[in-house]
Amino acid sequence: MPKIVVIGAGIAGVSTAYALLEQGYDVTVVERRRYAAMETSFANGGQLSASNAEVWNHWSTVLKGIKWMLRRDAPLLMNPTPSWHKYSWLLEFVSNISRYRENTIETTRLAIAARKHLFEIADREGIDFDHVRRGILHVYWDKDGFDHALKVNEMLNEGGLDRRSVTPSEFAGIEPALHGKFYGGFYTPSDSTGDIHKYCAGLEKACTKRGAQFIYDAAVTRIERRDRFNIVCATDGADQTLVADGIVVCAGTNSRDIAAMFGDRINIYPVKGYSITVELDGAAADSSAPWVSILDDRAKIVTSRLGAARLRVAGTAEFNGVNFDIREDRIRPLVDWTRMMFPKVATEHVVPWAGLRPMMPNMMPRVGKSRVPGVFYNTGHGHLGWTLSAATSAMLATVVATDLPIDARLAA
């Protein structure tokens, strides 16, 4: 059977490996970190959120970015230091504003399809990932924010999502722990949350049982094409060369550099997000911390309940290149917001984290073929990697099956 090497063991890479195994391929996954899901997929917001499918390509996003440029605690922060990569990405971002509606609807449809795939995989493989299926509540503080959400809701509905408007008086019935003087909100009962790292680890085990090999601490440094691909990886000690019939690039923010080895331009920019994981204490946590996931549109902050003992709070977007620094002035707003929205939640024990979202300028993942035969991409999912990966991986596996059919290789 054809041998496929998947580069990257985050949510996109592990999901791709699983989809290819389902097709019958011999799969090896190469990851530069020591374990699966140690970068973008380690401690993100935890939402499986079709309701968050609105792409960012809108003039309001541009205006907010300019307005907030001098605020170190702003939800959207842009480092003004000149960078050709950053500015070229921003120009492409603006050029895709005309596709805002079309891409939002398509993302919604993709997210709904992905949900079905992911739930089926988790059930089939018995993956425990602190899954909570209580929906997502979007909250808005003023009329302008709510009116924009009404327009977004039309697109989400056209994409097939049931997201209904709710009044502040209805909030208590949805999530009693929530505090605030809101204008209105939208509730999506079909959305859910969970621990993406636990899901990836469980899916990695499922892939291993199905015959996949995972090679860690192995950074791809060179790829050569002879009769087959020779993939050279730097490991502890001597370099290791893998031979493959096909390659799938799922390398997150590193995908841009890998793509350049094939002469492809994948204009991914690393957009940093932050999170805190609040360690909940005692039986009172059940009533003080939310079980329903919250998305505060003004603050750009989300919550996910990860079992009885943890609450994930995440958000913000920072354009600052490849930078994993955890800044106190970016973590502090998450802690302050948690105290404001859930005053009975103790925040003495929080674990901060920062990760880089692999963002394409059009906010759509790159799924499909390279200009080089036998090379494929499933990358650039941005802030919706977990929400979309199960569907894009199934799509990619179908493309691979067309280009590298198993029967043809066996016949050869």
From Swiss-Prot:
Q: EC number(s) per UniProt?
A: 1.4.99.-
**Pfam families attached to this UniProt entry:** DAO
Example GO CC term: the record gives:
cytoplasm
Return the Gene3D superfamilies for the record: D-Amino Acid Oxidase, subunit A, domain 2, FAD/NAD(P)-binding domain
By its UniProt entry, which InterPro entries does this protein fall under? DadA, FAD-dep_OxRdtase, FAD/NAD-bd_sf
Q: Which GO terms describe its biological process?
A: D-alanine catabolic process
Q: Which cofactor does it need?
A: FAD
Provide the residue positions that the database annotates as binding FAD: 4-18
The molecular function terms in GO held by this entry are: D-amino-acid dehydrogenase activity
Instruction: Kindly give the PANTHER family that the UniProt entry links to this protein.
Output: D-AMINO ACID DEHYDROGENASE, SARCOSINE DEHYDROGENASE-RELATED
Physiological role:
Oxidative deamination of D-amino acids.
- Annotated protein name in UniProt: D-amino acid dehydrogenase 3
Organism this protein belongs to = Mesorhizobium japonicum (strain LMG 29417 / CECT 9101 / MAFF 303099) (Mesorhizobium loti (strain MAFF 303099))
